[in-house]
Regions:
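Solvent-exposed loop/turn and edge beta-strand elements of beta-rich ligand-binding domains
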Residues: 1-268
Length: 268
């Protein structure tokens, strides 16, 4: 009995500053564009495959024999076998943006006098009808953040001088952020706007500088302290970014992130 076969291969690309893992994404071959009626392989298993670390995937060989085309009315035209390829999405997964692509695959099979001829698959985008290859693109989404605070400490041994809200101002500036100017609250706490990071920042380094702005309040000796915050962003591979921040003061000494302090003296 004459037989023939066809191969279906595709690729997966992942954007978002992230590499692919083996068997990370799955694809299915169906007989309907909705992806409900799965094609079976020669062993009766559903044709569902996964991509490898290079983003390549391949369905089991599609085999045909003379029985598949015995009822063809026009032998010269043969018979078209129509399939659809789509990606299997993971429900409620905010980490990735999955592809909505559905590809139509047409494979023509002819019985030419006892010899089976299987044409190369003709692949089109099911939405547009344009010729295509089996290519799916996903985007990896990740986020992380850094919250920076400082303390203003008033070194005065007098009840006549007290720290009040919005009395002193502080500046934060550096890589990738707009210059921030913040004022202390009644307890001396200075809170800067949260700095956020995305997948575009993976494996990048950032440097920020925090200082006090000199004011004109009579009798006060403002701090000349300068804090340098160096940040490295790394991927946790689960949609979260690790933001590692290290702080040094003006003398180059290490300072805990939560211990940035500006001392203020009053000269009566």
């Amino acid at each position: 009995e004459a037989t023939g076969s066809a191969e279906l291969k595709g690729t997966k690309t992942l954007t978002g500053n992230r590499t692919l893992d083996p068997e990370q994404f799955s694809f299915k071959l169906t007989t309907d564009p909705e992806g409900e009626n799965l094609v079976k392989d020669s062993t009766g298993k559903d044709m569902i495959v996964t991509s490898d670390a290079d983003g390549k995937f391949e369905f089991p060989t599609l085999n045909y024999n003379q029985d598949d085309v015995k009822d063809v009315e026009d032998i010269s035209k043969g018979k078209d076998f129509i399939y659809y390829v789509s990606e299997i999405k993971v429900p409620d997964d905010p980490t990735y943006t999955y592809s909505d692509k559905v590809y139509k695959v047409v494979i023509n099979v002819k019985d030419a006098g006892g010899k089976l001829t299987v044409e190369e698959p003709v692949i089109t985008d099911n939405a547009t009808g344009e010729k295509a290859t089996l290519q799916f693109e996903n985007h990896y989404k990740a986020k992380g953040s850094l919250n920076l605070t400082a303390a203003k400490k008033l070194n005065v041994h007098s009840d006549a001088v007290k720290l009040t809200a919005n009395q002193f101002s502080f500046v934060l500036f550096g890589d990738g952020i707009k210059k921030q100017v913040k004022w202390n609250d009644a307890k001396g706490t200075v809170t800067f706007d949260q700095i956020t990071y995305t997948e575009d920042d993976i494996d990048k380094d950032f440097t920020y500088t925090m200082t006090e702005q000199y004011g004109k309040l009579s009798g006060f000796e403002y701090s000349n302290e300068v804090y340098t915050i160096k940040v490295h962003v790394s991927d946790m591979r689960d949609g979260n970014l690790k933001v590692d921040a290290k702080v040094t003061n003006l003398e180059g000494e290490k300072v805990p992130l939560e211990n940035m302090q500006f001392d203020l003296f009053f000269n009566a």
